[in-house]
């Protein structure tokens, strides 16, 4: 009689192969040949996620059947009574992805086969062009085009145009300052120059990163309409999502939102009211694969497309999961590809998807198709530096949103 498969151990691995703190999870079973890996990165508070897994989820899960993914996700998510939030959801995500990885390995199928099979041959993606000036932006976009990219997100001067000179009080509080008026003016000038040079041969998008007030966001969106953007991202913060109906009624520019969402109430209304065009969830922030598959179905029913968040603060495992879901979703829109995915990422996370000429490609290995080289991970230790870009301020010294 075959021995029942159970979770034997859960290991949390922290690493920073490209200088950004990452958290990965490895779930092992009583069969030494069967294990799974997942992404649990909440980079700004990564050690809290480690504690949540080691102290709470690990003892809760050891001895359980790793194939009962739905039951494990549901019980683990409510076992602390209080639920959602970036710490618990990222911890859950690492476990959840690892269990799906195990499921795929047991079935000897890549995840995309378990999800119903491919509906496209590769995943179209956009890449960043983060420049310090308008002229630099034009040059960098040309570089991206020469690299084969057709869809490009353009930022000038950081989020909110941080590098711009501005009128400040005599004595100002330390922080990263930005001026919304200068920022909007600079971006309009930048898109004018980009359309002059490239015409409509490429698709462009932009991330406001919640740096504007609702009225400023409406004004900015109207000014951007003539540039035919793929979408305008995070024009408003999660705390102001009720303003999206007002924004939607005053502009025809496609709207994208979602990377900061943790709670179903944050996205459900936007989807059901068709207030956004693209849902930009960060999959580990909502709890992993299990909840995301349900969200995809909800969005599909209302004609909202996916555009998963794919930043540098995500393991190669997370990028692969994004791609498995994108390649199997009929309501897929586009996927983000990080410029931070470089040689060290592939050393630490062998099997990480590759991008070529604007498309992302998966391998055909069972499960997620990505592993963790623990020896390589240890060669890139994490650090405790605070991210200064989150400490942003308006010209008068008041705190802004990052």
Curated annotation (Swiss-Prot):
Entries under SMART domains matching the protein: MR_MLE (SM00922)
One record GO biological process: amino acid catabolic process
Chain sites annotated for binding Mg(2+): 207, 233, 259
Binding site for D-arabinonate: 209, 259, 280, 309, 336
GO MF annotation list: magnesium ion binding
PROSITE patterns in alphabetical order: MR_MLE_1 (PS00908)
Top-level lineage group: Bacteria
Keywords (A to Z) from UniProt: Magnesium, Metal-binding
Pfam families reported in the protein's UniProt record: MR_MLE_C, MR_MLE_N
Reported function: Has no detectable activity with D-mannonate and with a panel of 70 other acid sugars (in vitro), in spite of the conservation of the residues that are expected to be important for catalytic activity and cofactor binding. May have evolved a divergent function.
Family: Belongs to the mandelate racemase/muconate lactonizing enzyme family. GalD subfamily.
Name the UniProt record assigns to this protein: D-galactonate dehydratase family member EGBG_02030
Organism, as annotated: Enterococcus gallinarum (strain EG2)
């Amino acid at each position: 009689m075959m021995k029942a498969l159970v979770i034997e151990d859960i290991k949390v691995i922290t690493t920073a192969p490209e200088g950004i703190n990452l958290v990965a999870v490895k779930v092992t079973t009583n069969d030494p040949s069967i294990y799974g890996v997942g992404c649990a990165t909440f980079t700004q508070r990564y050690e809290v996620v480690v504690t949540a897994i080691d102290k709470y989820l690990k003892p809760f899960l050891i001895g359980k059947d790793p194939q009962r993914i739905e039951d494990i996700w549901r019980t683990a998510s409510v076992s602390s009574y209080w639920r959602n939030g970036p710490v618990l959801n990222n911890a859950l995500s690492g476990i959840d992805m690892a269990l799906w990885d195990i499921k795929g390995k047991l079935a000897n199928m890549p995840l995309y086969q378990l999800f119903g099979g491919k509906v496209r041959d590769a995943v179209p993606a956009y890449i960043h062009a983060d420049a310090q000036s308008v002229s630099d932006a034009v040059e960098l976009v040309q570089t991206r085009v020469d690299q084969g990219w057709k869809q490009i997100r353009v930022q000038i001067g950081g989020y909110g145009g941080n590098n711009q000179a501005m009128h400040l009080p005599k004595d100002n509080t330390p922080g990263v300052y930005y001026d919304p008026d200068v920022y909007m003016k600079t971006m309009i000038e930048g898109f004018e120059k980009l359309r002059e040079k490239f015409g409509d041969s490429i698709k462009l998008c932009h991330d406001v990163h919640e740096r504007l007030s609702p009225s400023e966001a409406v004004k900015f969106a109207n000014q951007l309409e003539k540039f035919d953007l793929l979408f305008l991202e995070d024009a408003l913060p999660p705390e102001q999502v009720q303003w999206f109906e007002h924004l939607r009624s005053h502009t025809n520019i496609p709207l994208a939102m979602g990377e900061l969402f943790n709670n179903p109430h944050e996205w459900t209304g936007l989807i059901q009211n068709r207030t956004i065009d693209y849902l930009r969830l960060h999959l580990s922030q909502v709890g992993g694969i299990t909840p995301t598959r349900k969200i995809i179905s909800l969005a599909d029913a209302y004609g909202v497309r996916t555009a998963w968040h794919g930043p540098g603060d995500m393991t190669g495992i997370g990028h692969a999961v994004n791609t498995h879901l994108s390649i199997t979703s009929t309501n897929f829109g586009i996927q983000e590809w990080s410029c931070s995915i470089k040689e060290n990422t592939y050393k630490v996370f062998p099997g990480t998807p590759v991008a070529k000429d604007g498309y992302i490609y998966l391998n055909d290995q069972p499960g997620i198709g990505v592993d963790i080289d623990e020896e390589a991970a240890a060669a890139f230790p994490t650090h405790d530096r605070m991210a200064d870009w989150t400490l942003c301020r308006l010209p008068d010294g008041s705190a802004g949103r990052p």
